[in-house]
């Protein structure tokens, strides 16, 4: 009977670890997918509109084509780069997780530190892009900055979608950091 009990314990201990391993892989796959989508959505974000410019009251308005592009604002460039870095890291860590399968604890420590770095990186990129996006949406009357989303609606909507998708990636990386901490806390 003693041998049967020890086998049951082994199975019970191994099952949560296997579930966590699958959860880890799925979160890494999710982080990879959504950061890739966010980077692609912002990289193709561009809109051209004819904007009437009034030079003088005595002249009719002059329609000038203006183009809104993601690379015209440094916050959007930073946002794209952070998502590209996080996407690349997610792909590499997913491959390492598949190859390693818990063999090297030193590697998992490094991955945990880099996961934490990705959380900070993505949230900072999301915050920067969201701040500029809100300025574009509402403007700032105190410094006489006009809103632009009423003119470049598609551009702003696509940027907002990219930020929302990237936030899902941020949360996936956050869960990759929190789940092992909770698991470690339960063991002690």
UniProtKB/Swiss-Prot annotation:
GO cellular component terms given for this protein: plasma membrane
Cytoplasmic-side positions: 1-23, 100-116, 183-188
Superkingdom in the source lineage: Eukaryota
Sorted UniProt keywords: Cell membrane, Membrane, Transmembrane, Transmembrane helix
Extracellular compartment spans: 45-78, 138-161
Predominant place of localization: membrane
Family under the similarity heading: Belongs to the Casparian strip membrane proteins (CASP) family.
Official protein name in the record: CASP-like protein 1E1
């Amino acid at each position: 009977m003693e041998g049967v009990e020890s086998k049951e314990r082994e199975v019970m201990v191994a099952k949560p670890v296997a579930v966590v391993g699958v959860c880890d892989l799925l979160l890494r796959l999710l982080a990879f997918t959504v950061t890739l989508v966010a980077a692609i959505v912002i990289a193709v974000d561009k809109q051209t509109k004819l904007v009437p410019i009034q030079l003088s009251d005595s002249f009719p308005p002059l329609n000038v084509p203006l183009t809104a592009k993601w690379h015209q604002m440094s916050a959007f460039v930073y946002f794209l780069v952070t998502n590209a870095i996080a996407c690349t890291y997610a792909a590499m860590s997913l491959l390492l997780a598949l190859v390693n399968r818990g063999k090297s604890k030193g590697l998992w420590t490094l991955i945990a530190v880099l996961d934490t770095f990705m959380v900070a990186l993505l949230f900072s990129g999301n915050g920067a892009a969201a701040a500029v996006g809100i300025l574009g949406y509402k403007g700032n009357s105190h410094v006489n900055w006009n809103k632009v989303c009423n003119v470049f609606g598609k551009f702003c909507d696509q940027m907002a979608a990219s930020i929302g998708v990237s936030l899902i990636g941020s949360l996936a990386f956050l869960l990759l950091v929190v789940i092992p901490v909770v698991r470690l806390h339960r063991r002690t």
